[in-house]
């Protein structure tokens, strides 16, 4: 079974100004003359971490990571202004041009898979391959499954902690109820809602519960960006024209090679998502990891993702 590549440090990093207010942190690792790949983090709002550098062979790949608008080290932190899917798609292109890259592989999981599909369908000529994990397409049923009723029946203990932040009278629409608190003028209200929202996802992302991973979701800096930006996208339907836009436009990536990795026991983004995408994009190979959940860092997901990236060099 494959494991992550050894730790690697960036050979370049900086801040890219993408509009009058947003500045994005980016970094480059691996071989400056290698095959380019851009890593798209989840959330939206999750930001990059050092382990995300390690799915690609650093001797063969030029590995580009960046924090999307409002996330991680990008500024302004947790900001929702001019923060849409299509702003992020444009940002990826601005980063590609700024780094002098002609075409690149696009790698992303969860929300990163959403953004990767949106980017590749908009810029297929610039996309050499797609390596996707934990498919998420922001359809209404997907949001209701995780944030209203569905996953709640598998994790009732974590669910009760999640909904404790919302009075019973508002629980018929939890995404909207959290939105009111995450956009409150009161800092304490925003933080309490952000931590409840973030801990719910942290508690459900792994097949075997990882207490350190869960605790990391309570960090105020992480939680505020993660919850505020996620919720902002969800109340706006991902800023898509129709909820199944990524499936509707799958023909635009029909000839792009790809690998879809999805955990059989992914509670955050059910396997149905990957199945639907694979039927719409048969050129991609689908790898269902039989003993994994949602997290990219579960052993079987790591193995499948590293095998996928190795196959393209």
From Swiss-Prot:
Q: Which Pfam families match?
A: Abhydrolase_1
Q: Where is the active site?
A: 110 (nucleophile), 266, 294 (proton donor)
MF terms (GO), sorted A to Z: aminopeptidase activity
Superkingdom of the organism of origin: Bacteria
Give its E.C. classification number.
Answer: 3.4.11.5
Give a yes or no for keyword Protease in this entry.
yes
Keyword annotations from UniProtKB, A to Z? Aminopeptidase, Cytoplasm, Hydrolase, Protease
In this chain the AB hydrolase-1 domain maps to 35-298
Q: Where in the cell is it found?
A: Cytoplasm
- Which reaction is recorded as catalysed by this protein? Release of N-terminal proline from a peptide
SUPFAM superfamilies of this UniProt entry? alpha/beta-Hydrolases
Q: What is its main location?
A: cytoplasm
Q: Which GO terms describe its cellular component?
A: cytoplasm
Q: Which GO terms describe its biological process?
A: proteolysis
Keyword Protease annotated = yes
**What family classification does the UniProt entry report for this protein?**
Belongs to the peptidase S33 family.
Q: What does the UniProt record say this protein does?
A: Specifically catalyzes the removal of N-terminal proline residues from peptides.
What name does UniProt use for this protein?
Proline iminopeptidase
Which species does this protein come from? Xylella fastidiosa (strain Temecula1 / ATCC 700964)
């Amino acid at each position: 079974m494959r494991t992550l590549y050894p730790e690697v440090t960036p050979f370049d990093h900086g801040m890219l100004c993408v509009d009058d207010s947003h500045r994005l942190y980016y970094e480059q690792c691996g071989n400056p003359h290698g095959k380019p790949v851009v890593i798209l983090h989840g959330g939206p709002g999750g930001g990059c971490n050092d382990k995300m550098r390690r799915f690609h062979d650093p001797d063969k790949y030029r590995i580009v990571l960046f924090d999307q608008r409002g996330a991680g080290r990008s500024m302004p932190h947790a900001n929702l202004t001019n923060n849409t899917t299509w702003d992020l798609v444009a940002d990826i292109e601005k980063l590609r041009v700024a780094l002098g890259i002609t075409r690149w592989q696009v790698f992303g999981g969860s929300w990163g898979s959403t953004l990767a599909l949106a980017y590749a369908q908009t810029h297929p000529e610039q996309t050499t391959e797609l390596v996707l994990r934990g498919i998420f397409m922001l359809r209404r049923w997907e949001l209701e499954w995780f944030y209203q009723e569905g996953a709640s029946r598998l994790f009732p203990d974590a669910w009760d902690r999640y909904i404790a932040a919302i009075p019973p009278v508002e629980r018929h629409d939890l995404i909207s109820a959290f939105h009111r608190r995450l956009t409150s003028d009161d800092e304490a209200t925003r933080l309490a809602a952000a931590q409840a929202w973030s801990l719910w996802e942290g508690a459900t992302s792994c097949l075997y519960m990882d207490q350190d991973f869960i605790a990391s979701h309570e960090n105020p800096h992480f939680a505020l960006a993660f919850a505020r930006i996620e919720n902002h996208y969800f109340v706006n339907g991902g800023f898509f024209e129709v909820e199944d836009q990524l499936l509707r436009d799958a023909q635009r990536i029909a000839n792009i090679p790809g690998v879809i990795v999805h955990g059989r026991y992914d509670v955050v983004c059910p396997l149905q998502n990957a199945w639907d995408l694979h039927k719409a994009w048969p050129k991609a190979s689908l790898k269902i990891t039989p003993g994994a959940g949602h997290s990219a860092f579960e052993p079987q997901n790591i193995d499948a993702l590293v095998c996928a990236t190795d196959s393209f060099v």
